[in-house]
Amino acid sequence: VNLSRRHILVLLPTAAIAWKFVEAGTPETAPNYNMSSHWWGMLIDIPKCIGCGNCVRACQAENDVPDGFFRTWVERYHVTDTDMTNPEVISPDGGKEGFPAAAEDAGKYFFVPKLCNQCADSPCTQVCPVGATFVSPDGVVLVDQKYCLGCAYCVQACPYGCRYIHPEKKVADKCTLCYHRITKGLTTACCESCPTGARQLVDLKNPSDPIHAFLKTHSVHVLKPQMATGAKVYYNELDGSVR
């Protein structure tokens, strides 16, 4: 998309209006939902993930994700004793239908679900020329597709590879932590479908949230901490080879 300076200046006020609308609450939120009382994130408990693909399928069904694109996906890592820093990583069709049988050889296998990291200091929001993507007051990175130009600047800026341009709508799309669900007191589709509890939604502003306590008592990590994005997807027992 070719964006002239005049085009951007014309669109910026409408994007600001969109932000005020979202800040006040959207039709997707429950009437009594208070954005400022929450700060959403997620825990991925790697030892519990069995690579079944339930989360990927549930996400695609819940959010009408087009074939070949993913708001969340699962990777399988194979770390061998001979090369512990360069694992084999596969994710056939996003792990949607599971994985082939592991080879009977040395090393270890484990699964790593990935999704938007809901960064508090998100690179994607900083490069959007019209403010169509933003961090909501409750900590979820959203895209107002009415104002998105489809320029893909945000797709290129995301260090986690979590965005794509919708092939039909021609606008940016990504995981929203099932915003239409969590603002009504429900959990995300991926968390609800996980048979082992490997994925857990967490309200970081709620000290009584059991996952909040887990984060304080376990050595959890975020992906690519050197990027200093304020990522809020936390991984328990994250192997150093994960990239």
Regions found by a protein language model. Name each.
Residues W19-N54, Q226-A228, Y234-Y235, R243:
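C-terminal segment of N-terminal export signals and the immediately downstream linker at the start
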